[in-house]
UniProtKB/Swiss-Prot annotation:
GH18 domain boundaries: 27-296
Role according to the record: Able to cleave glycolchitin.
Uppermost EC category: hydrolase
Catalytically driven reaction(s): Random endo-hydrolysis of N-acetyl-beta-D-glucosaminide (1->4)-beta-linkages in chitin and chitodextrins
Name of this chain's protein: Chitinase 1
Signal peptide: 1-26
Active site: E151 (proton donor)
Taxon lineage: Eukaryota, Viridiplantae, Streptophyta, Embryophyta, Tracheophyta
Keywords linked to the UniProt accession: Carbohydrate metabolism, Chitin degradation, Chitin-binding, Glycosidase, Hydrolase, Polysaccharide degradation, Signal
GO biological process annotation, one example: chitin catabolic process
Molecular-function GO term, any one: endochitinase activity
Domain of life: Eukaryota
Record EC number: 3.2.1.14
UniProt organism field: Tulipa saxatilis subsp. bakeri (Tulip)
PROSITE patterns listed in its UniProt record: GH18_1 (PS01095), GH18_2 (PS51910)
Amino acid sequence: MASVSPSSLLLLFFALLSPLLPLTSALVFREYIGSQFNDVKFSDVPINPDVDFHFILAFAIDYTSGSSPTPTNGNFKPFWDTNNLSPSQVAAVKRTHSNVKVSLSLGGDSVGGKNVFFSPSSVSSWVENAVSSLTRIIKQYHLDGIDIDYEHFKGDPNTFAECIGQLVTRLKKNEVVSFVSIAPFDDAQVQSHYQALWEKYGHQIDYVNFQFYAYSARTSVEQFLKYFEEQSSNYHGGKVLVSFSTDSSGGLKPDNGFFRACSILKKQGKLHGIFVWSADDSLMSNNVFRYEMQAQSMLASVNSRDRAMYWSLL
């Protein structure tokens, strides 16, 4: 019987093990979709196979529908364009693109022209209702994750931290979702709530979708990098994703140096991913998803380099 060298056994071990090992350095591209009911579909958005791609359905809200929406204490329902972004369409895009995952975002800025408030009756009742209603929606729509985007609050920071923290902990424990993100921006009230959540439950949060487009439209590359460092400090240890919008809001736009800033962060090893608000706006713009393709191409180049380094070590 021929002998097998230790080095051959080691190579065989790594070859068998490698499909099970995640590429923890893989960068993620994320895009919000569905809030504006302008018939945008998953298939409209270009998807690079070499990035981890997340669609984020905007939004699920714990409010009644109708002309005068009111809070429902954690009883969520879909408020995105469910005709074009249905359960079957979620399943289809995930079947077609193995690198795609789909999550839903909670809250958002407004519904029916009025602010959406985080407004729990109590921590326990809100959490119970939220776990039940969101589990049902997530399973119905074949979703993978959840994003927290409340922007207005009637509860104090500690109540917000406990409600959201307990919710995401239970959803992960029950294997309903595999990842969680939060979407704060630079506003004193918003930051006080999200930083309280981060302090208590940051270990449950996988991505920080920081809304850098909420800064001034006059933001320079240097200012953008300064803001990134500030928010990386505020959410210490978190994967803070950089962002731009394709609507008329502010921040550092792609034409004004966004990708230059990303290149600097990439060289520093600080670029964790990019997210965009939103596919709805991109569909209607003159640049129809041009910047999404550019962002994914940048991220894919980093991922390809890291994969090459990974295999060279085997």
